[in-house]
Swiss-Prot record:
<keyword id="KW-0245">EGF-like domain</keyword>
<keyword id="KW-0166">Nematocyst</keyword>
<dbReference type="GO" id="GO:0090729">
    <property type="term" value="F:toxin activity"/>
</dbReference>
<keyword id="KW-0800">Toxin</keyword>
<dbReference type="GO" id="GO:0042151">
    <property type="term" value="C:nematocyst"/>
</dbReference>
<keyword id="KW-1015">Disulfide bond</keyword>
<protein>
    <recommendedName>
        <fullName>Toxin Bcg III 15.67</fullName>
    </recommendedName>
</protein>
<keyword id="KW-0964">Secreted</keyword>
<feature type="domain" description="EGF-like">
    <location>
        <begin position="2"/>
        <end position="29"/>
    </location>
</feature>
<feature type="disulfide bond">
    <location>
        <begin position="6"/>
        <end position="21"/>
    </location>
</feature>
<comment type="function">
    <text>Has both toxic and EGF activity.</text>
</comment>
<dbReference type="GO" id="GO:0005576">
    <property type="term" value="C:extracellular region"/>
</dbReference>
Amino acid sequence: DQGTACTGEHAHSFCLNGGTCRHIQQLGE
């Protein structure tokens, strides 16, 4: 699965180990 780059507003809750980002709904948003 692909994700967006871990930058800006994504970095605080989307960042995953590996350089891509996916939405982590468990964090609340």
